[in-house]
């Protein structure tokens, strides 16, 4: 069985995360939209780095903790927790080649442990109705899913 680990994001890990995103994800799956032609343009790569620096690495602007998802030492995605009152909002993305292999369930368990150790009372997440993989992971963890049209809101008590 492959070793799955969460590595705290720092500059070297961010470079590995960008490589994983470029190799195995569409930019719209892993970052806010950036104008221009589709694909991983130089501008989109720079925006990816700045997005993560601002949200996690810059102490003046950080709003979340982010980890690189490593499988056998190779970056394959990211996981994050953002404080939201007595809760933490969670997010995970995995490269296409890492989906459907049980990695998401193991990352979810690791992220839940991090959320519990943070002292949060609840874990929140959101996804789309069509994201069957995310929905299955969250339901498997015991979360309540509230579906409204194409939006799915998730809440899971942590105690």
Q: Each PLM stretch: what is its role?
A:
Residues 110, 127, 150-151:
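Proline- and acidic/polar-enriched loop/turn elements at helix boundaries
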């Amino acid at each position: 069985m492959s070793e799955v680990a969460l590595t705290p994001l720092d500059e070297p890990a961010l470079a590995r995360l960008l490589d994983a995103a470029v190799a195995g994800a569409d930019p719209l799956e892993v970052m806010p939209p950036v104008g221009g032609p589709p694909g991983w343009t130089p501008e989109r790569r720079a925006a990816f780095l700045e997005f993560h620096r601002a949200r996690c690495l810059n102490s003046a602007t950080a709003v979340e903790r982010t980890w690189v998802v490593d499988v056998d030492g190779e970056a394959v995605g990211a996981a994050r927790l953002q404080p939201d009152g007595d809760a933490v909002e969670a997010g995970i993305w995995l490269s296409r080649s890492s989906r459907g292999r049980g990695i998401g369930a193991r990352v979810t368990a690791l992220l839940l442990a991090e959320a519990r150790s943070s002292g949060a009372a609840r874990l929140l997440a959101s996804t789309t109705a069509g994201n069957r993989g995310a929905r299955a992971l969250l339901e498997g963890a015991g979360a309540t899913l509230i579906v409204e049209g194409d939006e799915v809101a998730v809440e899971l008590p942590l105690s």
